[in-house]
Amino acid sequence: MGFCLFANVAIAARYLQKTHGVGHVAVVDFDVHHGNGTQAAFEDDPSVLFISMHQDPRTCYPGSGYDFEVGDGPGRGYTLNIPFPPGAGDEEYLAAMEQKVVPKLDHFKPEILLISAGFDAHGEDPLAQIELSEACFGEMTEQLVRVADRHCGGRVISALEGGYNLRALGRSVVRHLVGMGGN
């Protein structure tokens, strides 16, 4: 369906629900590509909030993740797609975090927060046309950790999803891990 044979974070979300009794799971995906597999897994499920920040689907594979895709049936309103035009950068992403992502998470009050941490939205990555810096990845991570501290006892799981410029990937992962630690 997408870049991955298995949607690792979607599998983890369902595992946490079925095996550990977690009720409400939030998934935030900031990979440059829309998380179509995760969205498909939960689009009719109100127990999982899925938020994807990605490049405009008219300009980037897989061609899904329009802002009008909000979930189906009982899951309507539990999918938030935030597509960005080519050339968008830190300012646009951080504004979306503050104005859309964090308020949606605060309203949902997850019991655990899962991050699909793709770093191919970095400005040096060759695969797409989003211009994020490693500092932006760190700030987004810190904001997500603060949400987890407020609502789920700091429970956050992050899974590496993508990044194709190894230098930019390395710097971004380091900044993300620092953000995960709250420093």
Q: Which residues fall in each region the model found?
A:
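Conserved alpha-helical scaffold segments that buttress catalytic/binding sites
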Residues: 1-143, 177-178
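Short active-site-adjacent structural elements
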Residues: 122-125, 165-169
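Short, electropositive alpha-helical surface patch
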Residues: 133-134, 167-183
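Flexible, low-complexity linker/loop segments at domain and module junctions
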Residues: 143-149
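A short helix->loop->beta-strand "cap" motif at the edges of active sites that frequently abuts
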Residues: 150-155
